[in-house]
Amino acid sequence: MAYEKGLILIPARYNSHRLPGKALADIAGKTMIRRTYERCKLTEMHAMVVTDDKRIVDECLTHSIPVDIVTEECKTGTDRVARCAERNLQVDWIINVQGDEPFANPDDILKVAHQMEHGDHREVVHGMSLITNPDDFWNTTIPKVIAWDGLLKYISRAPVPYPYGPNEELWKRSGYQEVCIFGYFKHHLKQFMQGQIKSRHEEIEDIEVLRFMEMGTPVRMLELVGSPLHVDTPADLERAQLIAKEYDAKE
């Protein structure tokens, strides 16, 4: 088993605002949470789903997927991961792969794992990928990343850095989007849970990594390949059907 000191946790809730029940949504014959777990297991790391809903627990148990239920109210997936981690998990660090990533790239996860194993313990690790589609740059459901010297400076749903002036193609040289893979040590998660409220910019943008920034925790950004789709809306779910069939045909 790879990276015995770490564990992949997959937070999943049923009551998603933009796509209720999406963790159990069917994607070409498999639920989204099952597909996400199977992608994570391609890394050969230990992985477990963390949820607040018995329906998701039942789905996991049906397919022999390790699962933990967190009954406390959690404002974000990272809060849910933190609740699970505080139960004395016997690992040094945790990778969070969000439950709506049915096409998560296992090589990306392993790149984050390598950084966790060999990087600076003071840093949270996060992923980003180059934006290649102009629609993604202007899409407010996709967080855009501002980083230099390998560290996150800001992340926003707005199209940033904004290509001011006549040359709107400038985004091609500087546009990066969030990849929803995170790495934390336990002390990061304990700090994240303090106060039990969202930070100011986290609340405005609805992007949880901003809480770490506002606490003064450095966030190391790794350039990753990324996945073809993060499922957040009904339209995304429709696209996912086609992508899943392509993936399944290759296996």
Predicted segments — roles?
Residues 3-51:
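N-terminal glycine-rich phosphate-binding loop and ensuing alpha1 helix
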Residues 51-52, 104, 147, 184, ...:
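A conserved hydrophobic position in a structured secondary element of the catalytic/binding core
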Residues 2-3, 172-251:
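Conserved alpha/beta core of the MobA/IspD/sugar-nucleotide pyrophosphorylase nucleotidyltransferase superfamily
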Residues 105-196:
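Conserved core of the sugar-phosphate nucleotidyltransferase
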Residues 14, 71-77, 226-228:
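Short, acidic/turn-prone active-site loops that include or flank metal/cofactor-
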